[in-house]
């Protein structure tokens, strides 16, 4: 959830061996599926605002929607409400998260024409038909993928022409001094206001050291452009978190 790439600002705050860490991001989030909602609201400043702003920039009537990293369904539930006639495909690497989001989303479908399918898979392993989706969306998940160029190329292949790719995620600050400052502000937010326990903060930092890969906005923009996206914009930003929107060329 909260992290930095290897060798970055995370080294200021935490060092430990990989043998002591969860062996995958899916394993980490699977182990905390039931407590995830509480923690994300306490550990991510302005979380609800970020989700609301992401929804603001989605197209009006997409028919086929892919969500990458659906987690417990915080964004998924909003997608069902916003697009009641759409075909939704929700993807997460954690079986525990898929089970939880299925129970929440299926329970919200009464009276809705939405069709929802669920896939347990890593983003890199998705096997879906090309040009299958009008909208691809994600929230605080893409930073778990190291090779974003390959990921963006794969996402582009799944999208119909003029489809929209919009995501909220953690973005590496630039210059490096800004990245470090963002980390300091986040840690102050968690510690001084008592939003997270010391054990929760340590767990987040451990996860970050093992599994998170930050990308700057400049790098995101270049990779998206190179892999077939245009109209790229950062429409919201708060410390480490930001929202990026783009269109399949």
Language-model features and meaning:
Residues 45-63:
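Conserved alpha-helix/loop element of class I SAM-dependent methyltransferases that forms part
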Residues 66-68, 72-125:
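Class I SAM-dependent methyltransferase SAM/SAH-binding core
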Residues 223, 227-249:
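Core SAM-dependent methyltransferase catalytic element
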């Amino acid at each position: 959830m909260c992290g930095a790439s290897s060798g970055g600002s995370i080294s200021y705050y935490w060092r430990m061996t990989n043998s002591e860490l969860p062996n995958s991001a899916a394993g980490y989030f699977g182990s905390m599926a039931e407590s995830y909602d509480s923690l994300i609201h306490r550990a991510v400043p302005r979380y609800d605002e970020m989700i609301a702003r992401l929804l603001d920039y989605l197209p009006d009537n997409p028919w086929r929607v892919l969500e990458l990293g659906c987690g417990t369904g915080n964004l998924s539930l909003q997608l069902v409400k916003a697009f009641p006639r759409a075909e939704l495909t929700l993807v997460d690497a954690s079986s525990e998260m898929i089970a939880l989001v299925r129970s929440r989303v299926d329970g919200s479908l009464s009276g809705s024409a939405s069709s929802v399918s669920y896939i347990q898979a890593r983003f890199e392993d998705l096997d879906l038909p090309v040009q299958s989706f009008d909208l691809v969306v994600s929230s605080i998940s893409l930073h778990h993928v190291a090779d974003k160029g390959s990921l963006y190329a794969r996402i582009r292949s799944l999208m119909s022409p003029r489809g929209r790719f919009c995501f909220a995620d953690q973005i590496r600050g630039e210059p490096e001094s800004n990245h470090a400052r963002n980390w300091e502000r986040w840690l102050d937010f968690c510690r001084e206001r008592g939003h997270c326990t010391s054990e929760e903060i340590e767990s987040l930092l451990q996860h970050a050291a093992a599994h998170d890969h930050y990308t700057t906005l400049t790098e995101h923009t270049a990779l998206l452009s190179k892999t077939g996206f245009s109209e790229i914009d950062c429409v919201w930003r708060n410390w480490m978190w930001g929202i990026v929107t783009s269109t399949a060329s």
